[in-house]
Design a protein with these regions (language model features):
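N-terminal intrinsically disordered, cationic/polar leader segments
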Residues: 2-118, 122-168
Length: 168
């Protein structure tokens, strides 16, 4: 050990036994809001044209308490054919996450990238079951890389902010 280096036990983050390592845990997951509309039943089951499926999603976050955050995944699906709307589905699927000792710069990447990734398989199942229960073949949503989407959005915001600052 070099003379300038402190022993490992002196550089530990806590001397009183308090755990200062980042900890993340999912406390609960739940359907916050759900709607399935089949406005043209029973005629829709005789339509000759396959509906076009439009899927939109959004992620929202909210701090509930000091170390408690909610991430919510909103999925909106419209299936439309030339004859009309086959079905419309709206799902708001949330998760409650305990985040302790997580650095401020890691909160948004977790809440907008990792948390939706954890919630998505369960929301996907709700969607597939609801569409099937509505009398249609189950709709299996393709996996979404939420972390990559978050990084792209953050990069676009930085470029936009730099462009705005450069033109001011």
């Amino acid at each position: 050990m070099a003379e300038n280096e402190a022993p490992d036990f002196l550089t530990m983050p806590s001397q009183n036994g308090e755990d200062t390592q980042p900890q993340v845990g999912m406390i609960a997951q739940y359907v916050k809001d759900f709607s399935f509309e089949n406005p043209n039943a029973p005629a829709v089951y005789n339509w000759q044209n396959q509906p076009q499926i439009d899927v939109q999603f959004n992620i929202g976050t909210q701090q509930i308490a000091d170390e408690l955050h909610e991430a919510a995944l909103r999925i909106e699906i419209t299936a439309a054919a030339p004859e009309g709307v086959a079905f419309k589905l709206e799902l708001l699927y949330g998760g409650l996450f305990a985040l302790r000792n997580v650095p401020a710069d890691a909160l948004q990447p977790f809440l907008l990238g990792e948390a939706p990734r954890l919630l998505f398989p369960f929301a996907r199942r709700v969607v597939a079951d609801a569409v099937r229960d509505g009398g249609f073949p189950p709709l299996l949503l393709e996996p979404i890389d939420f972390t990559q989407l978050y990084m792209q959005q953050a990069e676009a915001q930085q470029v936009g902010a730099a462009g705005t600052a450069g033109s001011a």
